[in-house]
Amino acid sequence: MAESTFGVSRETSPGPEREPAAATEILGHALELGRRYTADLVEHGERLGLIGPLEVGRVWTRHVLNSALVAPFLQAGGRLADVGSGAGLPGLVLALARPDVEVTLIEPMERRTDWLRDESARLGLTNVTVLRARAEEARDAGPFDQVTARAVSALRTLVPITAPLLRAGGELLFLKGARVEEEITAASKVLQKHRVRDIAVLELGVGLLPEVTRLFRATVGEAS
């Protein structure tokens, strides 16, 4: 909503989004933790620079549930790295939804890693490790079975910094926008170089959320 004072407009925060009916189906047993996380993100997210002022009005559908849709694709008992975790999207949401998975949240900014540690503690999550680092600096923490990322960068930039974190045969799980097919085409040489194969783009949340969630899913083969 725009508010005008002496002809100058500025954006004002909308009210918090009400919990959608789809939250129960998507989060299941983790619904209460999802509610607590969402409430904390609404309360602190804008002040800490984790989400923009307009995102409060769509925090459930565009952020929390969008992230939680990836949970069924995680390997049971596996190790997951979330690159550029920021507010914990998708990594912290996946950690609360899948307590059987060890999740490492990789984030270079101190105020964000402070938030991630504090929020993990508030939620009582014991399967989370927070690592203040760039992806390129996090290789010693691996190898991981899977790597996630959301709103970090285009594939041609993202693949070279994430593929080295994986074990041979590990998976890339990236939340992407409507132009993901164009990104795949633009990254063809990079994908070949890093032995990325079995590429699929899955549309998640159809009929559950207002916007389709696109998941780029691929396997990283063994190095020669």
Q: Model-derived features: where do they sit?
A:
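Conserved beta-strand/loop positions that form the S-adenosyl-L-methionine
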Residues: 83-85
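Residues at secondary-structure transition points
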Residues: 55, 90-92, 183
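S-adenosylmethionine
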Residues: 98-224
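Short hydrophobic/aromatic-rich motifs at helix boundaries and adjacent loops
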Residues: 38-43, 88-89, 130-131, 157-160
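Class I SAM-dependent transferase core
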Residues: 1-81, 97, 111-128
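Compositionally biased, intrinsically disordered/low-complexity regions enriched for serine, proline
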Residues: 11-13, 17, 87, 105, ...
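Conserved SAM-binding loop of SAM-dependent methyltransferases across substrates and taxa
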Residues: 87-100
